[in-house]
């Protein structure tokens, strides 16, 4: 970009017609936007919002950075009066070109400007503001969410399917936490109401952290599948009204959930790996997040600085470790309705003395359908319970004979592991004590 010149210097460089007037050309319009003292460097393309911005004062009062219709009217007036340029279409074309040559991303600029002071905060943040437990799970959950947000800012469209869900009573500050975590209020939104809206991109556009509160509060088995599918998307395909063709809009945002109800997750025995619930206890919080908003925002800025250190190191994955995944699956059951059928089957197996069971047997004897024949979906449900919820039983696929149920696939009781590395010790008289479980060698 060339340095700004005076109005007279700019006028002297403009192309003219044969009659000496200013030529109404895109080149002349570009010259003004690139060199004029008021306009040079003023127009930029905001990668986050996918819009053109005015990023420096240009002589009239403005409410926001985004280029508006009112701004265009002022610009048209200024170019006409100062430079004799009157072609609205060519002025708009020049604005598009100069904006494309001057791109910026406000979130990237913010994150790159941070310097971490070396104090660990991510591990203690949810305790500090919301009274959550200080443990590895809570730390890994928030760290993963923040790294996902950073990655989406620097690499739009990156695969990240995780939703951090804050669970606790009303007034705990859950929504406020997500709003302040987004740093600027305009980078936060809680206005996403429908996932099948053709204009959903407009709801995501320009935002970094989006809270899904109402949808989580009313989630059922069907809607939770829709939310899962929505979270899995990496882009939206959308045609902005003034454009001719639809285009891919890679996602630059992440999604947080809040719920006042403890059992907000519908029963899903296979697990809801996309949803990471964290229980909050506001009475245990060290401070209320709005008690000193400036201090809270400074604390959160240092959290982002800490997360940027991890991001720059490259020593992270945008997923839980296998051990944490196993913990998550168990932990999520605390946030689901009681699984009564799994409880009935477990109670039956606790008293059962046989070594094998089949699904028809469990249907009739554990679930008390003595005289009924199971439907196929009921068999699938029992299979899911046995494979996902019940421990101590292993599935076998080669059918075996059951006295009352014929040849069936099923499950066999796990054989307890024996300590072969530590043979029984001899007694004082030199004999080995034989337990009930040991076979005599004759």
Give the location of each predicted region.
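Amphipathic alpha-helical segments that form well-ordered structural scaffolds
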Residues: 125, 145-149, 176-180, 226, ...
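P-loop NTPase catalytic core of nucleic-acid-dependent motor ATPases
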Residues: 95-205
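Residue-level preference for alpha-helix termini and adjacent loops
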Residues: 38, 44-47, 53-54, 59, ...
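N-terminal nucleic-acid engagement/recognition segments and initiation subdomains in replication
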Residues: 1-121, 140, 372-373, 377, ...
């Amino acid at each position: 970009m060339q340095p700004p010149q005076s109005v007279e210097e700019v006028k002297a460089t403009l192309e003219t017609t044969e009659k000496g007037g200013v030529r109404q050309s895109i080149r002349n319009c570009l010259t003004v936007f690139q060199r004029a003292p008021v306009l040079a460097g003023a127009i930029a393309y905001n990668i986050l919002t996918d819009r053109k911005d005015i990023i420096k004062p240009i002589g009239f009062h403005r409410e926001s950075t985004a280029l508006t219709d009112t701004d265009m009217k002022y610009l048209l007036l200024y170019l006409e009066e100062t430079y004799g340029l009157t072609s609205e279409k060519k002025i708009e074309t020049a604005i598009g070109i100069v904006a494309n040559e001057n791109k910026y991303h406000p979130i990237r600029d913010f994150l790159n400007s941070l310097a971490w002071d070396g104090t660990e905060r991510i591990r203690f943040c949810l305790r500090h503001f919301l009274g959550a437990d200080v443990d590895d799970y809570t730390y890994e959950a928030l760290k993963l969410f923040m790294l996902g947000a950073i990655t989406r800012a620097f690499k739009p469209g990156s695969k990240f399917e995780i939703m951090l869900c804050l669970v606790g009573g009303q007034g705990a500050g859950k929504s406020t936490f997500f709003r302040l975590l987004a740093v600027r209020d305009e980078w936060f939104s809680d206005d996403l109401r429908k996932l099948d809206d053709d204009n959903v991109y407009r709801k995501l556009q320009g935002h970094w952290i989006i809270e899904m509160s109402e949808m989580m509060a009313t989630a059922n088995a069907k809607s939770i599948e829709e939310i899962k599918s929505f979270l899995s998307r990496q882009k939206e395909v959308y045609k902005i009204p003034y454009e001719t063709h639809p285009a891919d809009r890679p996602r630059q945002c992440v999604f947080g959930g809040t719920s006042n109800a403890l059992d907000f997750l519908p029963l899903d025995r296979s697990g809801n790996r996309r949803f990471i619930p964290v229980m909050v206890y506001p009475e245990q919080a060290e401070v209320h997040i709005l008690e000193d908003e400036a201090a809270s925002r400074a604390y959160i800025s240092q959290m982002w600085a800490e997360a940027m250190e991890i991001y720059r190191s490259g020593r992270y994955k945008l997923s839980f470790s296998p051990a944490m995944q196993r913990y998550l699956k168990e932990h999520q059951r605390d946030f689901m309705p009681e699984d009564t059928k799994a409880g009935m089957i477990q109670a039956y197996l606790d008293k059962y003395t046989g070594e094998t069971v089949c699904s028809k047997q469990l249907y009739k004897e554990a679930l008390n359908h003595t005289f009924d024949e199971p439907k196929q979906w009921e068999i699938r449900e029992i299979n899911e319970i046995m494979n996902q919820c019940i421990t101590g039983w292993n599935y076998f696929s080669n059918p075996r004979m059951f006295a009352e149920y014929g040849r069936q696939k099923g499950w066999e009781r796990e054989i307890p592991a024996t300590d072969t590395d530590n043979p029984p010790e001899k007694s004082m008289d030199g004999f080995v004590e034989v337990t009930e479980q040991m076979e005599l060698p004759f």
